[in-house]
Amino acid sequence: MISVATAECFTHGKIGIKIHKMACGYREFEKDPNYSIINGNVFVIASMFLPSKKGIESILDVKLPEPDYVFKYSKAYNQENDILVAKMVANALKNKLNCDIAISSTAGVGNGAICILTDKNEYNFTSDIYGDLIKGENILKRQDNGVNKAFNTFVEILKKEYGLK
């Protein structure tokens, strides 16, 4: 069984929850074309929504850079730093939980960033939607796109690295 953990910001834990529901055999997902790849092969150790710098640092024992923008209690970075922070969080998550696959997401101003870290590779990518957390622009569209893109990439990794079909 392949262990997975997520520490998500702009995707609000939805990547991990979707993987968990398929892994556990929720009936609503039985007709999904990826159901048989995940069910019986994957389990979720943790799926966390961590919007704050303090929460991430406390739970994962990692020191993040100072946010580029002030936004209520949440961290908000520019695109370049979102990519850096997604990598840092995925690495900290993998080290802390010793999972096979760690997934992290973060988004402030830009397309956001997602990192999927396996024992063999690091996959870094963004959503296809520009959003601005500070101004509240395209937040839900960016989130939906990020969740779908991360999930599809996760499935491709299962096929490529683990030979699942």
From Swiss-Prot:
One family name in Pfam for this protein: HcgF
InterPro entries tied to this protein: HcgF
Sequence similarity: Belongs to the UPF0254 family.
Name of the protein in its database record: UPF0254 protein MmarC6_1720
